[in-house]
Amino acid sequence: MVWENDDGRTGRESVIYLDDPETAEQNLLMAQTRPSRLLVGEAPRLIDEWQDAPQLWDVIRYDIDHSHALGKFILTGSAVPPDDKKRKLVKHTGTGRFAWLTMRPMTLFESGESSGGVSLGDLFAGRKALGDSAPNKLEDLAYLACRGGWPVAATMKRGRAALRQAFDYVDAIAEHDISRVDEIRRDASFTRRLLKSLARLQGTQSAVSVIRADLGSNEPNTFSENTVYEYVNALKKIFVLEDMPAWCPNLRCKTPIRTTDTRYFVDPSIATASLGLGPDDLLNDLKTFGYIFETLVARDLRTYAEALNGSVSHYKDKSGLECDAVVHLRNGHYGLVEVKLGGERLIEEGVKTLRRLSGEIDLKRMPSPSFLMVVTAQGEFSYERPEDGVIVCPIGALKP
């Protein structure tokens, strides 16, 4: 299995760190000459930074084929995957031998900042245990969006030091990580400008041409669309960007559906740090806060959905009808979600969108949605509206 290392270490019995400064050179030499030696150890055997020696992939596959053991190895790595040259050292895909897990920054439930009173799994099963209180006020959500779900920051006392972690991460992206992904030196200053532009475009279906135009709105833009595309692709490879795919349901009408992905950072704190914003800035600009909060909800919903063997997409058609998130499971069940900061007017807007989209779905060709839900930032508790059955749930009450 391929896990991010902090989580992988909790499930191992033995470990080897390929990038240990004292043994790194020896480890890489061993990987080239006698790689099976690196696999020796009590199972599960964790191999950290495996991408530095990708030839281990085939050695592990061979071992699994002959031992028929399950859960024998855990491969963990940093955000930087093998480059194209290293990928050529892998001869077999490993289908049927390896399971992949995408590790993201922590959700509010994982960091202990959601009560977990409302289970996404229960909603799909028709169980609506609502009424649970949410621990967070709007000020809390502004802080949590800026702090992000980084494990180190989540364990720190609330304050400037915890908020600083996201800024340090953005610095590392611009100065090092975006160039390390494929050993192509990229401009740190342009990377910062690009991150800032992408932060302004969170939750939109912006094409590369739109991103380039935004980049040139404040200062001369000497980079081509192709260069912008390459930088964006590099950010995806290091798991900074995780765009949300479009949902294409069966509809009764013939309105064309937009199929462009929605732009999101993997964590809202990347957006706030790129823009140089703190919690007070978000509270003073609720429009911007709304986009940042949408990124936070997208992060959490993705993790919650994957725990249920599901995924998250978005909907938008040519008429302008748009749904922020569609959570769908492998069995064909799905739920429609709108994201709002809160307040009666915004909640009503979300309800109107959900009911309109639900009414457009062709129920002869697909099932009706398991639930309609407005996820909010503020709100003391979750509830189901008696007049239409729409669930209103603060993000601080949600769990898988």
Feature map (PLM): residue ranges:
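Conserved P-loop NTPase "ATPase switch" module shared by AAA+ and STAND
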Residues: L39-L56
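P-loop NTPase Walker A phosphate-binding motif
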Residues: M1-E13
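Accessory nucleic acid-recognition modules appended to NTPase machines
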Residues: R158-H333
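Short glycine-rich substrate-engagement loop in P-loop NTPases that contacts/grips substrate
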Residues: E13-P44
